[in-house]
């Protein structure tokens, strides 16, 4: 099969796939060598970017996926009436602990958060952002939790190594809080001195 036809087949496979597709899966489905498919994926990615299309080809969670451009998110949201997945502060805390400490038990999560996390962990399991990765080899054999492929997809990561370090995360958090405080003060919100008065 010629290159033009193979590229069209790869594009069709990516379009029809419900999630990321590994290079090996694409090659198998297209009946082609992975070494021939990989450069065509790079070509498609470049073509979509240059053409200014409404979608891009991204590599994440060890696979390739066609996704809408981030700048078109508002219009895509209008199309879908269902609410996007939102995470509570408690869920984000538990998810951060799991992401950075995995594999981790629920008791470890409870200890680090200082409160019972059973409901939060169940919610994260239901959303498929975390998964059970095994059992700890201690009396009682508690379940061990880790992040899932859906976690990587949700946050647009290729792998866990793309997570910011704890130091970077702390700096980003401080910067975000500072910007939020400046915005509130500039918008006529309460300032630190007026709250203390």
From Swiss-Prot:
Database matches in InterPro entries: ScpB_csome_segregation, WH-like_DNA-bd_sf, WH_DNA-bd_sf
Superkingdom, natural source: Bacteria
GO (cellular component) term, any one: cytoplasm
Gene3D superfamilies listed in its UniProt record: Winged helix-like DNA-binding domain superfamily/Winged helix DNA-binding domain
SUPFAM superfamilies tied to this protein: Winged helix' DNA-binding domain
Subcellular location(s) of the protein: Cytoplasm
A Pfam family this chain is assigned to: SMC_ScpB
Keywords recorded for this protein, A-Z: Cell cycle, Cell division, Chromosome partition, Cytoplasm
GO biological process: cell division; chromosome separation; DNA replication
Quaternary data: Homodimer. Homodimerization may be required to stabilize the binding of ScpA to the Smc head domains. Component of a cohesin-like complex composed of ScpA, ScpB and the Smc homodimer, in which ScpA and ScpB bind to the head domain of Smc. The presence of the three proteins is required for the association of the complex with DNA.
Function, in words: Participates in chromosomal partition during cell division. May act via the formation of a condensin-like complex containing Smc and ScpA that pull DNA away from mid-cell into both cell halves.
Family according to the record: Belongs to the ScpB family.
Name listed for the protein in its UniProt record: Segregation and condensation protein B
Lineage of the species this protein comes from: Bacteria, Pseudomonadati, Thermodesulfobacteriota, Desulfuromonadia, Desulfuromonadales
Encoding gene (name): scpB
């Amino acid at each position: 099969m010629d290159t033009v036809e193979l590229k069209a087949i790869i594009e069709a496979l990516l379009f029809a796939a419900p999630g990321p597709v590994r290079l090996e899966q694409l090659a198998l489905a297209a009946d082609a060598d992975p070494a021939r498919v990989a450069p065509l994926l790079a070509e498609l990615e470049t073509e979509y970017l240059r053409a200014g299309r409404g979608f891009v080809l991204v590599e994440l969670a060890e696979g390739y996926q066609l996704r809408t451009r981030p700048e078109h998110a508002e219009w895509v949201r209008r199309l879908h009436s269902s609410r996007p997945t939102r995470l509570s502060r408690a869920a984000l805390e538990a998810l951060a602990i799991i992401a950075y400490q995995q594999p981790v038990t629920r008791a470890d999560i409870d200890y680090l958060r200082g409160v019972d996390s059973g409901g939060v962990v169940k919610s994260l399991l239901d959303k498929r952002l975390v998964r059970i990765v095994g059992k700890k080899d201690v009396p009682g054999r508690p379940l061990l939790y880790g992040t899932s492929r859906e976690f990587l997809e949700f946050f647009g990561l290729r792998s866990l190594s793309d997570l910011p370090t704890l130091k970077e995360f702390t700096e980003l958090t401080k910067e975000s809080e500072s910007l939020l405080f400046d915005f509130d003060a500039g918008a006529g919100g309460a300032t630190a001195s007026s709250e203390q008065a």
